[in-house]
């Protein structure tokens, strides 16, 4: 659907599976006059994204290697996918009921999005945080500038949106991030939540506020420490 949207044309899709680990998709342009594909649905954080391309592209140089029928980056397998695919996937989760306790869901507050969007955003945040917390990678953050560098290295190179500004709020590690809108925003917020918890060794709470073209994320400790 993303390719059809970009090419303004319809395609036939067929696939072959050479082995248990590889599926090859074959696209052939369709000449018949058939109904157009559905447009990509919008969330609050995907509107006006065409104004925000530069933060997605300025991630520096890196080398991706063709290996074993796929792509390899720094020893890890990876894939390339259009960001709109993520939006389509998340849009289909809006009617799903979240299976998480009140203690978890109440650790994140939202301003500026609908209840259906809150459910989708929250599910994505905790899923991404859970994936990162499974790794053993240490996270050390000593200053606001290190947040930017860490995000560029761990998120930006893989196509995820990075914060445009970072500012410390107090001596207990609370910090606020400013983002432009992006289809990958929920994933980046979930990653930052996991990074913060690992760097500070505390359970995080988040306040997320959406404006017309930006999102502001405040992360602080869920528990009060004396």
Question: Language-model segments: which ranges?
Answer:
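Short, surface-exposed linear patches
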Residues: 46-49, 198-202
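Short, non-transmembrane amphipathic alpha-helical segments
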Residues: 2-7, 189-200
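N-terminal accessory segment detector
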Residues: 1, 11-184, 210-226
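Low-complexity, intrinsically disordered Gly/Pro/Thr-rich segments
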Residues: 8-13, 199-209
């Amino acid at each position: 659907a993303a390719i059809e949207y970009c090419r303004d044309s319809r395609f036939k899709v067929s696939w072959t599976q050479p082995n248990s680990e590889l599926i090859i998709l074959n696209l052939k342009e369709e000449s018949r006059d058939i109904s157009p594909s559905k447009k990509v649905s919008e969330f609050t954080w995907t509107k006006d994204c065409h104004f925000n391309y530069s933060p997605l592209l300025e991630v520096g140089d890196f080398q991706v290697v063709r290996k074993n029928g796929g792509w390899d980056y720094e020893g890890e397998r990876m894939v390339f996918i259009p960001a709109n695919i993520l939006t389509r996937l998340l849009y289909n989760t809006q009617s799903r009921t979240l299976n998480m306790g009140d203690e978890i869901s109440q650790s994140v507050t939202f301003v500026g999005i609908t209840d259906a969007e809150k459910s989708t955003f929250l599910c994505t945040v905790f899923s991404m945080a859970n994936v990162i917390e499974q790794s053993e990678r240490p996270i050390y953050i000593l200053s606001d500038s290190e947040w930017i560098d860490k995000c560029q290295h761990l998120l930006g190179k893989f196509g995820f949106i990075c914060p445009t500004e970072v500012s410390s709020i107090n001596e207990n590690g609370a910090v606020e991030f400013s983002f432009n809108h992006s289809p990958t925003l929920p994933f980046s917020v979930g990653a930052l939540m996991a990074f913060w918890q690992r760097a500070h060794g505390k359970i995080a709470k988040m306040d997320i506020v959406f404006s017309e073209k930006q999102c502001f994320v405040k992360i602080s400790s869920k528990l009060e420490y004396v």
